[in-house]
């Protein structure tokens, strides 16, 4: 099984982002904690990209202790940039436990370039 995953940084917060739009990945809390461990891959949060019929994607955020959180602005911006590149669209809607978040890519560059700008309307 191939897993599409990314390690990204947004204003000092780092994330492991897993594309789970095919819904084939189901990690346990212990597995999430292990991925977030700085002695393994390491990140502030693990983010799952999942399918959503009313938005470009649904995001699930997990903190390094394995607990799920509602949303994260920096993580949302990272995922929005990935999906923007994929869909060639500067305006992205992402569903989260905290509600729908709209992201606008301000300066569109290749998402693998470390320099890009976006904003997220959090509420």
Language model feature labels by segment:
Residues 62-64, 120-123:
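Secondary-structure transition/turn motif
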């Amino acid at each position: 099984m191939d897993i599409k995953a990314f390690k990204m940084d947004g204003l000092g917060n780092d994330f492991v982002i897993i594309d789970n739009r095919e819904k084939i990945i189901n990690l346990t809390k212990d597995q999430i904690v292990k991925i977030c461990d700085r002695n393994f891959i390491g990140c502030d949060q693990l983010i799952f990209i999942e399918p959503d019929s009313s938005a470009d994607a649904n995001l699930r955020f997990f903190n390094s202790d394995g607990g799920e959180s509602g949303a994260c602005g920096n993580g949302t911006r990272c995922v929005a940039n990935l999906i923007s590149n994929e869909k060639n669209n500067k305006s992205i809607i992402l569903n989260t436990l905290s509600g729908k978040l709209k992201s606008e890519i301000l300066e569109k560059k290749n998402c693998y370039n470390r320099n890009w700008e976006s904003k997220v309307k959090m509420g």
